[in-house]
Amino acid sequence: MLEAKSLRKATVPRSLLQHPSPGNVQSNRLALHVNDDNSSCWVYIASGCRIYKLEISMQDSLVNRGKESLLIPEQCEVMNSSLVNHCPHRSEIQSIALAETERSDCLILGSVDSYGHLIVSKLDNSGKDVDRLTFSALPRDCGVGEGGWAGICFSPSQWCMAAVARSFCKSIDVYDQDIHLQTIRTLWYPSSLCFMQTLCSGNDSSLLAVTEGCQLSIWDLRMKENGGCVHRICGSLGDIFYTVCSSSTNIAVGGADRTVTIYDPRRWSALSRWVHCSKYEITGLAFSSIDSDYVYVQGVDYEVLCGQWRDSKKVLSFRGDSNWLGFSKCANRDVLGGWCDSGSIFLADITKENYIQSTDGLSNGVPS
């Protein structure tokens, strides 16, 4: 079973950012990176046309619990904070994402604004800004027309490949660095996207999962027939999907129906439905990197919970103190971060509880 090692609450210094810009329902304006020695975590947040970073300690601490096992955060101070040396956008940043290169010696920071303008920078793995590489890419229509929500995701196997979704334009642009590869046209307004990490796609990361309206669509970037769309799954009519995530074996979606649905990509059938797990709409999902039978769920009502989706059982949860402006999970470990419009940042470190096996082969219930 998963348990919390620490839950910390820090406040963005007023000298760095006094009034954050409002966010969309999809909270994509936060990204995390834990330092190599696991002593601290860099939290990247986007407000307006700029990106800021804060360093928060990852020291283990006593975790207090309230009613219904709700985790109570420990107040802490921000160790370091600064403006990221990242080219500013001309309009409000809608989403940011972090990726690691093949050698893991540097980070790739990508951001997209409300008109679909993509900017990518290379940063040092320790969190320092290094002018190694910066490039930008404009959408095919050069960003004309009306702006709106936009999302970004990197390929898990090729950091140079990124997909940018634009809700108002009903389009998804795929880039290899600053080279435009193709444009996908969706039927409805896209709200979330991710490259699939499933066994059926291997390591080529050619499959892209997109939530659009009340549908989950799967796109194969290698195909031209039917625009590349290989499968569509319809949810309840009128219940919009807001988020999608993928593990090595399954894919999950959530949205206005407050239900997490897990699909098997080999047959595209529903394995499990965790009905009404959140009090309000689900706007963020992430599979646990420790055990993919667990999933993290972020709701509009400030709550973040972790549960076993097969048994529809909640194991832990915590709450923000106001609306989420950003929420994210580290790519390869269970560290969660959330940013509220009050200026508070919540950082949770989750681990798996180990049990010592007794001589008769049964667990004695004592943590190792």
What does each model-found stretch correspond to?
Residues 57-64, 117-137, 167-192, 199-206, ...:
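Per-blade loop-tip surfaces of WD-repeat and WD-like beta-propellers in eukaryotic adaptors/scaffolds
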Residues 91-185:
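Alpha-solenoid helical-repeat scaffolds
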Residues 39-44, 103-110, 158-164, 182, ...:
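Structural hallmark of WD40 beta-propellers
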Residues 2-31, 36-42, 59, 301-304, ...:
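Terminal intrinsically disordered, low-complexity extensions flanking WD-repeat/beta-propeller proteins
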Residues 1-18, 37-87, 115-136:
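Beta-propeller domains
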Residues 24-34, 88-100, 140-154, 186-201, ...:
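Canonical WD40 repeat/beta-propeller blade segments in eukaryotic WD-repeat proteins
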Residues 46-50, 112-116, 165-168, 212-213, ...:
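Short, flexible beta-strand-to-coil junctions
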Residues 27-29, 40-42, 48-51, 93, ...:
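A common structural microfeature
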